[in-house]
Amino acid sequence: MSNNINFNKNPDSSVSISKMDVIIPFTPDVPCDNNGQRMWWAFLASSMVTFFGGLFIILLWRTLKYLWTVCCHCNIKNKEAQKVNNPITIQADGTTKTGNEKEEAPASEVGWMTSVKDWAGVMISAQTLTGRVLVVLVFALSIGALGIYFIDSSDPIESCQNFYKDFTLQIDMAFNVFFLLYFGLRFIAANDKLWFWLEVNSVVDFFTVPPVFVSVYLNRSWLGLRFLRALRLIQFSEILQFLNILKTSNSIKLVNLCSIFISTWLTAAGFIHLVENSGDPWENFQNSQPLSYWECVYLLMVTMSTVGYGDVYARTTLGRLFMVFFILGGLAMFASYVPEIIELIGNRKKYGGSYSAVNGRKHIVVCGHITLESVSNFLKDFLHKDRDDVNVEIVFLHNISPNLELEALFKRHFTQVEFYQGSVLNPHDLARVKIESADACLILANKYCADPDAEDASNIMRVISIKNYHPKIRIITQMLQYHNKAHLLNIPSWNWKEGDDAICLAELKAGFIAQSCLAQGLSTMLANLFSMRSYIKIEEDTWQKYYLEGVANEMYTEYLSSAFVGLSFPTVCELCYVKLKLLLIAIEYKSEQRESSILINPGNHVKMQEGTLGFFIASDAKEVKRAFFYCKACHDDITDPKRIKKCGCKRIEDEHPSTLSPKKKQRNGGMRNSPNCSPKMMRHDPLLIPGNEQIESMDANVKRYDSTGMFHWCPSKEIEKVILTRSEASMTVLSGHVVVCIFGDVTSALVGLRNLVMPLRASNFHYHELKPIVFVGSLDYLRREWETLHNFPKVFILPGTPLSRADLRAVNINLCDMCVILSANQNNIDDASLQDKECILASLNIKSMQFDDSIGVLQANSQGFTPPGMDRSSPDNSPVHGLVRQASVTTGSNIPIITELVNDSNVQFLDQDDDDDPDTELYLTQPFACGTAFAVSVLDSLMSATYFNDNILTLIRTLVTGGATPELEALLAEENALRGGYSTPQTLANRDRCRVAQLALYDGPFADLGDGGCYGDLFCKALKTYNMLCFGIYRLRDAHLGAPSQCTKRYVITNPPYEFEMVPTDLIFCLMQFDHNAGQSRASLSHSSHSSHSSSKKSSSVHSIPATNRQNRSSKAREARDKQNATRMNRMGPEKRWFTDEAENAYPRNIQIKPMSTHMANQVNQYKSTSSLIPPIREVEDEC
């Protein structure tokens, strides 16, 4: 056959051809093809023969197999028909066997074909390491083959290539040999050979592998259908899943969409590149156009997007026909895939990723209840400037993305705060925030949730998840309910020694309120001490000026200098206050067994050890450094405390590992209190102290305290025994008591009244000092709480409502020492402004009541009550002579009240005469400054305070809970009730711990300092004489005016300076010893003792509740009480034993009021006329 060669390069030039000839244009690009003959059909034929030949063989095999099955089925039917006549043979061993069993036996054996098939399945399965490696390798080689195609696409579609000289052809050959072997494994492992043959991956192999072998044989290369390798990209998501790179559904879906879109795009571009560069076969390939592969990619994109610029278009008929069909499918794919891809990318977690730790910088993880309010409160305290330089990064982890306000807050603190979206219950998210290298994990609770138990359960699950991931991580979590703390003890890796802490908001809130019942305003002072507040300077002489000066003080810890070693605590305390301008209130003391405990104002017998940690009240952390730097040789003559800095003396502290910031020493210094070493404020064994005689008699058969000796205890009482009707309450003289107004019903969450009662029943009070507690509220609710209250003495219940004035008058609310208003319904209301409506209404209701001041006095005197100021039996130099007692009031506004609030902004409704702005922070409002309002939000600062020093939380709990210990918590977790214990020297020693009291300056041993005296002189005198540590003033709001005022409201001044001038109406906050005469000499003790006491006994007269007639089991004791009442002005009480068995019903319910004598009436009138001049002091004899 003759060939006509046309040397014209113009593709449009006409050529003369015969019908039977195949004429192709010759160009220098194909120099080896002297004839100009194309061999594309040979490459294509190899693929088509392989595909259709294999398909024919498979179909033929299936047909033959089907026919064979039909034939075998007919034979089986014939055999079943013969089975009836088949005899059963009996073998020698006695078994029977038919003839067919010989044929069925081999059927149960596995043939070699099945074994090979299983082996091939394991080889290509991603379930094994070999299979995963093979699958990933095939995918990688497919992408490599596609890359070779991209390189070769710049060459002509068909060209002559020498296999031994063409490097890319050799590599492609090696890839395809591997593909052929892998195809064989897949074919062997396939269960359905027909469907396998029609799979996309199989079709790709048919049209890419055989042409390579043809290329070697013909020494030609045809670009052909090698672009089909792009279809392997569809498996990209599967490969990433095999490698555990893709784990979420969104990421898998995104990769799937992208891989399908890109593979379809590249494959279609490859087909257009082939037909446009080759031309139409029926046009003798003369209508081709030179297009690069990437121009075809561009053409397909503008076609799918329906833009169609027209700069590049298809000229061949095959290309145009393909574009017609592709635009239909491509447009649909583009319109559906691209928006979905963009949506998935746009919806990807903005706060995904992982935390990158910075060398030399710690980080903490904060999770739980993450809201704008909780985060802002936390950051405000954690990053406060008074903490010095906080080189800690805060990583927040929450499963909900932050709103715009919270996001803005994070951006304002971007240098120290990062946010990641995720859950601590997911180990993957814990790995993202590097929880294993975090310094601590803090879990915030939702204080306003409707179901506190559910919230606690969520936080406990978070603790379990975190501890399960990394058992050594330190966790500080907030808990809402006290009884849920016990569940944390069930976590094996929960370790108090390593700094794990649970801040129970209900326990601390109730403890703060209970301490206010003992010393009004103390809750405000303590809340301010453990919160970081900036100093706000006010020039005007207003009460806010003095209040804010005290607010700037906080609690810090620092190691004491070696200059203090060997000195007693009062000596060191005085030196720190006078010289260093620091207030030392407690130390961490190590016993001989190297067990550490926190001692609050321990007394003279405790000497400072080397490396003793002190708890200071100061305005910032830099001031506290003075206690560490103080050197007697260098700083003894310095009067300006600011000049006390590190000196050049060789001191032990230089070698002490205390170069850390004082905020972090406790956690890294290993001085954490162990769970077995309870923070009992034990100073000494009372049996071993000189001057404290041993107990003469000890009744071991009487249980008066719980098993730890920390609380007064009584046998369980049925609730019916303590219920008072309104008439019974009216006939029962109640004075100096605590009225607890509680709102709640059957469905309300429990507030945990035990946490309120326990501090009021601490064993460092004598029995007669215990204030009776009267609960006024729903009986249905109180029944639910009673299980935790039935072991406490002097607790009564008046069923009713706090909004009923008749109920309030029945309990003599005008004679109470404190009225507490609580609500268990606060979190069930969605509107935040209405959450406190019940408490606010009850508070305003009480303040608007009016009372006749004579009624309470008459009732009290008829039952043995001495009006405040009439009891003058204590010596003038006794410190209890100045202890505060509430005088009779005539208006409800003078009743001491503390109201619990949920919403801070509602504090504006408590006082109608204040001018507080609704946006004013809680601590700046008048009710909070006066100690008449308390909100749980003030406890948020304890999270950061506990992180920087875990002993701070121990100190707080010891101060406000009355001495709750880890042992007691473990006991309550087991029995949910206090267990009584016999009095032993060890348990009695636990009573010897200090307590908070308020001291009046109008009368008593400090009266000379009350009128214009300096606070520092009072501080030193009280400390030296009575070991009494003063730490604040409770002052009348208008005292600075210097003129008499009708306002009886007071406010708190924390840690006044030495030269602060006092006024006679001031009340002093002080830490009082259990034995308040411990600081006096023996002569003073003898003088302070009552003359009727034995010389071996010390007087322990202290302020107490109003005394009523007590019923004793002994008639002799009853006669002594009667004699005492008859000679009340002398207060000559009989000698008492330590372990007097007090009657359970110390307060009779039904008492007839006797007619008052003329002598008593004169005393009452005298009291009424001089009540404003007599200081509110009253004492009774010590019961213990």
From Swiss-Prot:
Binding site residues for Ca(2+): N468, Q908, D911, D914, D916
Region (Disordered): 655-677, 1082-1143
Gene3D superfamilies linked to this entry: 1.10.287.70, NAD(P)-binding Rossmann-like Domain
Ranges where the RCK N-terminal domain occurs: 361-503, 735-879
The entry's keywords: Calcium, Cell membrane, Ion channel, Ion transport, Lipoprotein, Magnesium, Membrane, Metal-binding, Palmitate, Phosphoprotein, Potassium, Potassium channel, Potassium transport, Transmembrane, Transmembrane helix, Transport, Voltage-gated channel
UniProt PTM: Phosphorylated. Palmitoylated.
Protein's name according to its UniProt entry: Calcium-activated potassium channel subunit alpha-1a
Catalytic activity: K(+)(in) = K(+)(out)
Record's compositionally biased regions (Basic and acidic residues): 1116-1125
UniProt record similarity statement: Belongs to the potassium channel family. Calcium-activated (TC 1.A.1.3) subfamily. KCa1.1/KCNMA1 sub-subfamily.
Task performed by this protein: Potassium channel activated by both membrane depolarization or increase in cytosolic Ca(2+) that mediates export of K(+). It is also activated by the concentration of cytosolic Mg(2+). Its activation dampens the excitatory events that elevate the cytosolic Ca(2+) concentration and/or depolarize the cell membrane. It therefore contributes to repolarization of the membrane potential. Involved in determining peripheral auditory sensitivity.
Biased composition (Low complexity): 1084-1104
Record note on domains: The calcium bowl constitutes one of the Ca(2+) sensors and probably acts as a Ca(2+)-binding site. There are however other Ca(2+) sensor regions required for activation of the channel.
Ranges in the topological domain labelled Cytoplasmic: 61-132, 190-193, 276-289, 343-1184
Encoding gene, per UniProt annotation: kcnma1a
Residue ranges, Extracellular side: 1-39, 154-168, 215-254, 311-321
Lipid moiety-binding residues (S-palmitoyl cysteine): C71, C72, C74
One Gene Ontology cellular component: postsynaptic membrane
Molecular function terms from GO: calcium ion binding; calcium-activated potassium channel activity; large conductance calcium-activated potassium channel activity
Phosphothreonine found at: T659, T866
Recorded topology in the membrane: Multi-pass membrane protein
Residues annotated for Mg(2+) binding in this entry: E393, Q416, E418
Motif window: Calcium bowl: 908-916
Cellular localization per UniProt: Cell membrane
Subunit and interaction comment: Homotetramer; which constitutes the calcium-activated potassium channel.
Example of a GO biological process term: potassium ion transmembrane transport
PTM annotation (Phosphoserine): residues: S661, S674, S678, S874, S878
